[in-house]
From Swiss-Prot:
An accessory protein needed during the final step in the assembly of 30S ribosomal subunit, possibly for assembly of the head region. Essential for efficient processing of 16S rRNA. May be needed both before and after RbfA during the maturation of 16S rRNA. It has affinity for free ribosomal 30S subunits but not for 70S ribosomes. Signal peptide: none annotated. It comes from Streptococcus pyogenes serotype M28 (strain MGAS6180). GO terms for molecular function: ribosome binding. The keyword Chaperone applies. This is Ribosome maturation factor RimM. Gene3D superfamilies: PRC-barrel domain, RimM. The gene is rimM.
Amino acid sequence: MEYFNVGKIVNTQGLQGEMRVLSVSDFAEERFKKGSQLALFDDKDQFVQEVTIVSHRKQKHFDIIKLKDMYHINAIEKYKGYTLKVSKANQGDLQEGEFYYHQIIGMAVYEKDRLIGYVKEILQPGANDVWVVKRQGKRDLLLPYIPPVVLNVDVPNKRVDVELMEGLDDED
């Protein structure tokens, strides 16, 4: 079965079995909602078990979750550093123009017909995502995911068309 990373358990939260998760999910509210089915993977990326979310809330930059049948700090401390993943079957359907992060990673980024590089990761610093583009012989380009910059995302052809605003590429 294919799984996709949605977050890392970075610490416990209180004594009642809550976990502090650093989310890397494109749809965190949906992914961590009550009843969601996720999989737990250890620090060697080995499957541990399926888990069910029983509660979720946001606190600062973290998602605080509680898992079914894990109601005390002693039951969850061993999971610090583990990864939460969603199975492909549990990802859900997307609306037109939506896509998952794992579909974007590795896509070729073009301005007109000039290859700029490839998306290597996606950051979530605030109001909008920032795509990190790996370039040949240059520093990585930080590309804000906003309409004037990202013109088209063609998932089947693994291509992103952009228009670099003045000052966005400091190496040109």
